[in-house]
Amino acid sequence: MLQMLPVEPHLEVRKRLPQSASRRPPLLFVHGGYCDAWFWEPYFLPWFAARGYPAYALSLRGHGASGGSDTLFMAGLGDYEADVERIAATIDSPPVLIGHSMGAAIVERIMAKRPVRGAALLAPIPPAGLLPIASRLATSHPDYLMHMGGVDPSRMSANVLQALRPFYFGPHVAPKILAEAARHLNAESSRALFDLSLRLHWALPQRNHSPLFVLGAEGDVICTPDDVRATAAHHKVKATILPGLAHMLMLEPDWAHAAKALEGFLATLE
């Protein structure tokens, strides 16, 4: 018998709130594939909260401390989209949606269906989907896909971690951050990855002209600067590409460069 996904699994939410009342918009951060809400915790959540932005990050179903790990393989982008919408509805006022990589694709799907207060796509999956990325990496770095296909947090070896590091981080990432990131790696839904391969995040272009910011990293070998520019062109905006950062730009030593660029966009919404 086909097992249906639970309608509302428990979802982990991490938050940092300003110390005093603020009129600045709340922010809802959406993590990328294989990750969870922790990836925003070391730097972005406290940094934005200190500047008056109520900052929230959720773990999608089957990730982090959220429920649904037993049915993760059945979860598609539509299920992740529902998770984001459910948490957004619990926040006092409409949040700005900020997605990283796969999380950016989820934000794009939401933008295609309704106006949002504002949105930021960080290192987004390009309009062409995952297949060109996978093809490029299979040619240039064939070991990458082998390692990613077998990501199992319970059996994450030092060798696998070392093999994946150059794809996600720059050479100077703090060892403590790298070790903690490895602890928060999750298995990813094969259905969600299939959805990204079919470009299901792209099928409905934005029609409501919500304020949008697209940010990429010069050192990103997963979602390259050209990939990021393709996403920006699709939405008829200009991409911002920052030097000195890699794919996990929110955890890099120079993470503040990305945070300040994002803050500049947020200032236009006030």
What do these predicted regions represent?
Residues 65-95:
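Active-site loop/oxyanion-hole signature of alpha/beta-hydrolase fold enzymes
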Residues 221-230:
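Conserved alpha/beta-hydrolase "acid-adjacent" motif
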Residues 31-36, 101, 218:
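Active-site glycine-rich loops that stabilize anionic/oxyanionic intermediates
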Residues 115-150, 192-196:
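Flexible "cap/lid" loop of the alpha/beta hydrolase fold
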Residues 47-69:
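Conserved alpha/beta-hydrolase
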Residues 208, 214-216:
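Short beta-strand/loop motif that positions the catalytic acidic residue
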Residues 238-270:
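Catalytic active-site module of serine/aspartate enzymes centered on a nucleophile-bearing elbow/loop
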Residues 33-45:
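The serine-hydrolase catalytic nucleophile loop
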